[in-house]
Amino acid sequence: MRVLITGMSGAGKSALVQELRRRGLRAFDADEDGFSEPRTDGRWGWRTDRVAALLGEQGDGHLFFAGCSEEQATLPFDYRVLLTAPVEVLLERLRTRTSNRYGQSPAEQAQVLADLAEVEPLLRRSADLVLETTEPPERVADVVLRRLAER
């Protein structure tokens, strides 16, 4: 099953990918694994050719792909997980994270808040599972894997 893990910056996508990898599962992060590129408008988008090729690979078990981009609606994911967190948690994670500098400037934080108001409601409508990520990544992974096993 091809599983999309999506959500706003700071929602815990990368942390969940790391936990899934720790468990030996195939998990990819759009921000870290060369699946994203800058667009002409200054934002980042997915290299849909690379993402589609990855999703087309045959393999045993689940394939997890984490990221958030306008292009995600056009790709053949079988299951969509939306990660969310309270605003104050998102902002604190953005201010203190070391793996990715996005979200540390006031302008970027304002963009995340705008996306939270405008984009997250759209993601909720297409999500098969919505999880608040105030729990540790290990617990979030447990819930995701349990729900997938029930399908």
Task: Name each model feature, range by range.
Residues T48, P137-L145:
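Short, amphipathic alpha-helical "lid/cap" segments that border enzyme active or binding sites
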Residues H62-G67:
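Structural recognition of the conserved hydrophobic beta-strand(s) that form the central parallel beta-sheet
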Residues G24, D60-G61, F77-Y79, S126-A127:
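Short, well-ordered alpha-helix to beta-strand connector turns
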Residues G7, G12:
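Conserved glycine(s) of the Walker
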Residues R125-V140:
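Phosphate-binding beta-loop-alpha motif at adenosine-nucleotide cofactor sites
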Residues Y79-L122, S126-L129, L145-A149:
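A glycine- and Lys/Arg-enriched "phosphate-lid" helix/loop adjacent to the NTP-binding pocket
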Residues A15-G59:
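Conserved substrate/cofactor phosphate-moiety recognition/catalytic segment
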